[in-house]
Regions:
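Flexible loop/turn segments at secondary-structure boundaries
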Residues: 242, 374-376
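Accessory, non-ATPase domains that flank or precede helicase/AAA+ motor cores in DNA-metabolism machines
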Residues: 1-369, 381-397, 431
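Conserved interdomain hinge at the start of the Helicase C-terminal
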Residues: 251-252, 407-432
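Short intrinsically disordered coil segments
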Residues: 21, 67-70, 404-405, 418-423
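Internal, well-ordered alpha-helical segments in soluble enzyme and binding-protein domains
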Residues: 217, 350, 376, 419-423
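Interdomain hinge/linker at the junction between the two RecA-like core domains of SF2 helicases
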Residues: 376-418
C-alpha cells in the first residue's frame, strides 16, 4: 500500500503542512514526487488540488480515516525533487507558505493544451499505391483518389504529408483517412510539437579571440569546474569589457561536458539581439523564457528543458527554476539589477536562490556586473565569492572620458533642466 504526503494548493498558514492520502493501485505509476493531484479535502470532501512532496508505504494515521487520491493530473511540468527541496529552503529563508514556494519554483504549473503534429504516411510502395488509385478511380471514390494523388505527388514519398495541409488543401476528412488507415494504405503518425517563438533563428558561429583578461577568467572558472570545485564568481568588468563572451565560453565548456546552463538576464535587457547572439553560438539547444511569451509557449519551453531537448535557458528571474537535472552553471548578468528581487510572496532574491540551487546540484554560479551590488561585493571580501576583474575593454577599445558635473552650480545658474549645460552643449555639437 502506498501513501503520499501532499501540500494543499491553498496558501493559508493553518494548512501549511503535509496531509497524508492513500494512493489507489491504478494511480501508483503516475503518483511521483512533484505531481499535481486531485484530492478530497475537509468535512465536505470538496475536490482540491495539491502537490506530492513525499511517498511512503507507512500510514501515519488510522488507515480507515485516510482518504484516497482522486486523480493524478498528468498534464503539466512535474516539479523535480530538488526543486521541492529548494522550495522548502525558500519558505524557511523568506517566509510565506510551502504552497507559495512551490508555486514560485513551478512558474508554468497550469494545464496547457498540448500541441500535436500529425503526418499521413503511405504504407505501400509508390507503384502499389498507384494500382490502388486506379482501382478506386474505377469505383468513383473521388475522396480517396484525391488523397492518394496528393501523397503520390509529395516531395518525399516516404515522409508523406502534413495532416493539416492534406485536410485544407486536398479536402481530406478524418473519417476517410481512418478508413484508409484501416485498409492498411496509410498510417497517421502523431508527434509532440513545441511552440518555439524563436524557431526562425539559426546558428551562424564565428570565432572570437579573447583578450588576456578574458582568457584568464575563462581558464580559472573552467579549470575549477573540471576539478569539481563548485564556486560563486563575481565577474566585475567595466562596460564593454566582454563579459558576455566570458559567459559564452564558460557555457560552451559546460555543454561539452554534458551539463546544462541557465542564463539570467533582466527583462529590460532581454532584447532580440541578445537572444540572437546566443542562438548564433548554440543553435536550437537554446530556449528563452520571458513575460511576452504566451502561456503555451512558456509551458513548452519548460517541457523541452525537462525532456532534455535543450541545454541552455535564457530569461529573467523565473528562468532560474528551469527543470534541469544536469545543471552545470548559472550565469546572472547585471546581478545588481533590482528586478532580481521578487515583489510577491515569497519575496526571494534570485542571486541567493541561484547560489542555493547550485549548491544542491554541484553547479557553479557566475555573477556579472560593471557596478556590483553591495551584497555581492561584500561576499568577495569574506571569501564566499571569488572576484574576477576585467579592467580593459574588449577589442582594444578605449574607455570613455568621464566628466563630473556639480548640479548645485547648475541650479545656481538657473538651469533647472535634468541636463547640465555641459551635456546639452555636447549633445548639440553631436547633432550638428
Amino acid at each position: 500500500m502506498l501513501f503520499a504526503d501532499i501540500i494543499i494548493d491553498i496558501s493559508v498558514k493553518s494548512l501549511d503542512r503535509p496531509f497524508q492520502y492513500r494512493v489507489p493501485d491504478p494511480l501508483q505509476a503516475d503518483a511521483v514526487i512533484g505531481a499535481l493531484v486531485d484530492i478530497p479535502f475537509g468535512k465536505g470532501n470538496r475536490t482540491v488540488q495539491g502537490y506530492i512532496i513525499g511517498l511512503s508505504d507507512q500510514a501515519k494515521f488510522d488507515i480507515r480515516r485516510t482518504k484516497d487520491i482522486i486523480a493524478v493530473v498528468k498534464q503539466g511540468v512535474v516539479a523535480q525533487s530538488h526543486l521541492l527541496s529548494l522550495a522548502y529552503w525558500i519558505k524557511t529563508h523568506y517566509g510565506g507558505t510551502m504552497n507559495d514556494a512551490i508555486k514560485a519554483v513551478m512558474p508554468v504549473r497550469r494545464e496547457i493544451q498540448i500541441k500535436e503534429k500529425k503526418r499521413v504516411i503511405p504504407i505501400p510502395t509508390r507503384e502499389d499505391l498507384r494500382k490502388i488509385r486506379e482501382e478506386l478511380a474505377g469505383k468513383h471514390q473521388t475522396a480517396r483518389v484525391r488523397i492518394i494523388d496528393a501523397l503520390l505527388q509529395a516531395e518525399d514519398y516516404a515522409d508523406g504529408m502534413d495532416y493539416d495541409v492534406l485536410c485544407k488543401a486536398h479536402k481530406a476528412t478524418l473519417s476517410v483517412l481512418r478508413a484508409m488507415q484501416d485498409k492498411g494504405w496509410i498510417r497517421i503518425e502523431v508527434s509532440r510539437s513545441y511552440r518555439n517563438p524563436y524557431h526562425t533563428l539559426h546558428a551562424a558561429d564565428k570565432e572570437v579571440i579573447l583578450n588576456e583578461q578574458q582568457q584568464k577568467a575563462v581558464t580559472q572558472i573552467c579549470g575549477n569546474m573540471d576539478a569539481g570545485q563548485q564556486q560563486v564568481y563575481l565577474l566585475h568588468g567595466v562596460t564593454g569589457s566582454g563579459k558576455t563572451e566570458v559567459y559564452m565560453q564558460c557555457i560552451e565548456h559546460v555543454i561539452r561536458s554534458g551539463r546544462q546552463a541557465i542564463v539570467l538576464i533582466p527583462e529590460i535587457a532581454l532584447t532580440f539581439q541578445t537572444v540572437q547572439r546566443f542562438y548564433a553560438r548554440f543553435g536550437d539547444r537554446v530556449s528563452v523564457m520571458h513575460s511576452r511569451l504566451s502561456a503555451g509557449e512558456r509551458y513548452d519551453q519548460f517541457e523541452r528543458a525537462q525532456t532534455g531537448e535543450i541545454d541552455i535557458m535564457i530569461g529573467p528571474r523565473s528562468a532560474l527554476f528551469t527543470p534541469f537535472e544536469r545543471l552545470g552553471i548559472i550565469v546572472m548578468d547585471e546581478e545588481h539589477e533590482s528586478s532580481y528581487q521578487s515583489e510577491n510572496v515569497p519575496k526571494y532574491h534570485a542571486r541567493e536562490v541561484a547560489v542555493q540551487r547550485a549548491k544542491m546540484l554541484g553547479a557553479s554560479v557566475l555573477l556579472g556586473s560593471a557596478t556590483p551590488s553591495l551584497e555581492a561585493y561584500y561576499h568577495t571580501t569574506t571569501g564566499e565569492y571569488t572576484r574576477i576583474e576585467l579592467t580593459e575593454r574588449a577589442g582594444g577599445a578605449s574607455l570613455p572620458r568621464v566628466e563630473i558635473v556639480d548640479l548645485r552650480e547648475e541650479l545656481a545658474a538657473k538651469n533647472f533642466s535634468i541636463f547640465s549645460r555641459s551635456l546639452t552643449a555636447k549633445i548639440q555639437k553631436r547633432l550638428e
